[in-house]
Amino acid sequence: MFDQTTHTEVHPLTVGKIETASGAIKPQLLRDAVKRAVTNFFAQMDGQEAEEVYEMVLSEVEAPLLDIIMQHTRGNQTRAANMLGINRGTLRKKLKKYGMN
């Protein structure tokens, strides 16, 4: 995202929203969706102890995120890594982890 006033690059989340062609998406919407999903997950556990919830939630969010970003960049790993704010080597490891290489 480019700030026209200061002529500098600004990370979208620093201004509290993500800009899209159709307008702004507030990160709070994503947070709320994850919160609902995790709440539903625990409700379905029926008193059983859950294990490795952190890793499960991260992978359930990360895999579709990577898939969408790779589609958006038409497989360009350099662009995808830049969009995600990670280096290309890290992206390649994550793609391999989810069988997307």
UniProtKB/Swiss-Prot annotation:
Give the domain of life: Bacteria
Q: Quick one: signal sequence residues?
A: none
Picking any one GO molecular function of the record gives: sequence-specific DNA binding
Task: Return the InterPro entries for the record.
Answer: Fis_DNA-bd, Homeodomain-like_sf, HTH_Fis, Trans_regulatory_Fis
Keyword Transcription on entry: yes
Which UniProt key words apply to this protein? Activator, DNA-binding, Transcription, Transcription regulation
Q: Where are the transmembrane segments?
A: none
Q: Can you tell me which residues the record assigns to a coiled coil?
A: none
DNA-binding region as annotated in the record: 77-96
Q: Does the keyword Thylakoid apply?
A: no
Per the record, the similarity remark reads: Belongs to the transcriptional regulatory Fis family.
Q: What quaternary structure, including any partners, is listed in this protein's UniProt entry?
A: Homodimer.
List, alphabetically, the NCBIfam families matched. Answer: PRK00430.1
State its role: Activates ribosomal RNA transcription. Plays a direct role in upstream activation of rRNA promoters.
The name under which this protein is listed is DNA-binding protein Fis
**Organism, per UniProt?**
Shewanella pealeana (strain ATCC 700345 / ANG-SQ1)
